[in-house]
UniProtKB/Swiss-Prot annotation:
Organism whose genome encodes this protein: Cavia porcellus
Position of the signal peptide: 1-24
GO CC annotation: extracellular space
Name of the molecule in the record: Alpha-1-antiproteinase S
GO molecular function: serine-type endopeptidase inhibitor activity
């Protein structure tokens, strides 16, 4: 007989983390797939960004849509009924247009591509299943998450929460190369399964900034608040242009390899307009721009992070059952009814001058006689980090105050 005590599943993403718990006994239970995954991820990122801005329009935002979506897609493998439908719809998949098998195969291909070794940059993802020693997973769920999501399984003694926390945090710290530490705290002894996804990216600018040119400058948080920030500077030929639709300047800074940072600088007082008019379709269009212009770029050094309660955020996207006693995760295990008792997402970003002494650093750029356009990111702006090989939004952010971690 299943225990009548609610138990939890912990979900950690980007780190993204979901905690699964046992429920009470009486709980109620067109495009090709390879193109559909990035498109759906872009729409999911857009929806999640809007939820986060509604919660606070004065805070920095930073999250990894691909990390959160991967963790949820893994959960959907074992979900049934409305729980299953809510997850896939919340991830912006139209189940009348794409088969579920194609969704999971699409994630498999995406993860395989993202994890290919690159000499130019580091981009790795990982999925871990931490199982209570007494919990027996269904064979199909176990095989599917290993095959499709390359998940590793680790036996865990959740009856000793401190040891379980230590084990999960060590996995996360290693996967993120020490960037995310002590993510899991106050773990409940009722937890029986933790599902962890992490993503780690380290890139070098194709055209690095010179440290000697970085100086302290003003950043205008709002009309009444100004802070001093280290501002990087570089004059040269950039993929940059003004878009009247969103009333913003768009700047693309390439990393070595297939990754690009896309920065969006709204005109004075037009941040809300930018947020209301920016669409995934425009982002894809911007990312493919190739024309260049001469510009004098001023970009603040950044070290920001985002930590989010996924239960609250995803609830606004219609994903509610999986966090409640209405959850049907009967495809995960027959031993006990599960629900996600806690969902955590943490992502960190550092942007600085670093680059290699490669073509970008030594490349000759002839300047026109006219003055270059001055693109100074000295006020709030948006940005995305996009993988071109898959058209996937790896990270999404909004900088309101670069001095806030």
């Amino acid at each position: 007989m299943p225990s009548a005590i609610p138990r939890g599943l912990l979900l950690l993403a980007g780190l993204c983390c979901l905690v699964f718990g046992i429920m009470a006994e009486d709980a109620q239970v067109a495009q090709g797939p390879s193109q559909q995954i990035p498109r759906s991820l872009a729409h999911f990122a857009h929806s999640m960004y809007r939820v986060l801005t509604q919660q606070s329009n004065t805070s920095n935002i930073f999250f990894s849509p691909v990390s959160i979506a991967t963790a949820l897609a893994m959960v959907s493998v074992g979900a049934k009924g409305d729980t299953h439908t809510q997850i896939l719809r919340g991830l912006e998949f139209n189940l009348t247009e794409i088969a579920e098998a194609d969704i999971h195969n699409g994630f498999q291909n995406l993860l395989h591509t993202l994890n290919r070794p690159h000499s130019e940059h580091q981009l790795t993802t990982g999925n871990g299943l931490f199982l209570d020693q007494k919990l027996k997973l269904k064979e199909k769920f176990s095989e599917d998450v290993k095959t499709l999501y390359h998940a590793e399984a680790f036996p865990t003694n959740f009856s000793n929460p401190k040891e379980a926390e230590k084990q999960i945090n060590a996995y996360v710290e290693k996967g993120t190369q020490g960037k995310i530490v002590d993510l899991v705290k106050d773990l409940s002894a009722d937890t029986v399964l933790a599902l962890v996804n992490y993503i780690f990216f380290r890139g070098k600018w194709e055209k690095p900034f010179d440290v000697k040119h970085t100086t302290q400058e003003d950043f205008h948080v709002d009309t009444s608040t100004t802070v001093k920030v280290p501002m990087m500077k570089r004059e040269g030929k950039y993929k940059a242009f003004h878009c009247s639709t969103i009333q913003s300047w768009v700047l693309l800074l390439d990393y070595e390899g297939n990754v690009t940072a896309l920065f969006l600088l709204p005109e004075e007082g037009k941040m809300q307009h930018l947020e209301e008019t920016l669409t995934p379709e425009l982002i894809f269009k911007f990312a493919r721009k190739t024309e260049r212009m001469f510009a004098n770029v001023h970009l603040p050094k950044l070290s920001i992070s985002g930590t989010y309660d996924l239960k609250e955020v995803l609830g606004h996207l219609g994903i509610t059952n999986v966090f409640s006693d209405a959850a049907d995760l009967s495809g995960v295990t027959e031993d006990i009814p599960l629900k996600i008792s806690k969902g955590l997402h943490k992502a960190l970003l550092t942007i600085d001058e670093k680059g290699t002494e490669a073509a970008g650093a030594t490349m000759m750029e002839f300047m026109p006689m006219s003055l270059p356009e001055d693109l100074s990111f000295n006020k709030p702006f948006l940005f995305l980090i996009i993988d071109h090989s898959t058209d996937t939004p790896l990270f999404v952010g909004k900088v309101m105050d670069p001095t806030k971690k």
